[in-house]
Amino acid sequence: MTALNKKWLSGLVAGALMAVSVGTLAAEQKTLHIYNWSDYIAPDTVANFEKETGIKVVYDVFDSNEVLEGKLMAGSTGFDLVVPSASFLERQLTAGVFQPLDKSKLPEWKNLDPELLKLVAKHDPDNKFAMPYMWATTGIGYNVDKVKAVLGENAPVDSWDLILKPENLEKLKSCGVSFLDAPEEVFATVLNYLGKDPNSTKADDYTGPATDLLLKLRPNIRYFHSSQYINDLANGDICVAIGWAGDVWQASNRAKEAKNGVNVSFSIPKEGAMAFFDVFAMPADAKNKDEAYQFLNYLLRPDVVAHISDHVFYANANKAATPLVSAEVRENPGIYPPADVRAKLFTLKVQDPKIDRVRTRAWTKVKSGK
């Protein structure tokens, strides 16, 4: 064989080996698809997981249970893990969109708070399909200085009167008001405020007093959205919002970091408020199950989930993590409510589809103002 042929052959072999090597690496690249709420994980959680495991995470976000439910019910989600609220998970279970979790692959499950597991089990019997992640309340986020400037030093910031009493909201309109785009939660909040069952099974409660009040409030509501209010509160663009505790505290923290002089706080009203639990679940069509279990175990580590709580300002469901959560978060009664406040909290129950339809139509009417 000539030197030229030898050179040509060695180059061919080297090229073939390189191609095989690249192909092998591509074949070995593991991927995980996650669909979570916006602003609901620490900035470095996914990157740290990727670095530790070599798994590539494709991470997408949503800002309402309705958006997630639409994708789940349509089938072929393409996601390996999703994060519904427990009350939504309950009705999705009847549609068979999730697969049971194999607890033998979740050795760190023991770190979860038994009391929270019992509460979530009301929606997911025996905690068969879902792993609790974070929990919080739906309350009032407000700009302390602007609200006092409009309503005075004695503004009822500890009451739903602040935002559900028409004469108050009419005055607050000048500095900006937002409501969650979450019909189940807003209607439950209004019904509770009116002294009715927040989980009423009477269609007339939704189409009558609840809708009547919301229509009176509607002209003074700038927008309905479930994430925009975070930055708007932080920047001082709105002064009051029906929002989720962790999101409002994120707004407060962003304002402090920006040193913009905006003072944001959160209130769990004295009349009672809704508590919710968000959970990780695996869609029935999940393709990367092993990778999904690795991520769930990663989140079950106390140090990991405590770090997330410190960034998102939500209480986590991991009892072993509580001592590791910063005092700023752990000792904040708006994030970890004391017993007397917890006693006034309520949760959503799955409703008959007829009530769902009534509520959806009423919500469309409220948002349009007609």
From Swiss-Prot:
GO terms for cellular component: ATP-binding cassette (ABC) transporter complex, substrate-binding subunit-containing; membrane; outer membrane-bounded periplasmic space. It is found in: Periplasm. Disulfide bonds join 175-239. CDD domains: PBP2_PotF (cd13659). Putrescine binds at residues 38, 247, 278. It comes from the Bacteria. Transport is feedback inhibited by intracellular polyamines. One of its GO terms (molecular function) is putrescine binding. Its main location: periplasm. Residues 1-26 form the signal peptide. The keyword Transcription regulation does not apply. InterPro entries: SBP, Sperm_putr-bd. Keywords: Disulfide bond, Periplasm, Signal, Transport. The keyword Cell inner membrane does not apply. GO terms for biological process: putrescine transport. Part of the ABC transporter complex PotFGHI involved in putrescine uptake. Binds putrescine. Imports putrescine for maintenance of the optimal concentration of polyamines necessary for cell growth in the presence of glucose. The complex is composed of two ATP-binding proteins (PotG), two transmembrane proteins (PotH and PotI) and a solute-binding protein (PotF). Belongs to the bacterial solute-binding protein PotD/PotF family. This is Putrescine-binding periplasmic protein PotF. It comes from Escherichia coli (strain K12). The lineage of its organism: Bacteria, Pseudomonadati, Pseudomonadota, Gammaproteobacteria, Enterobacterales. The gene is potF.
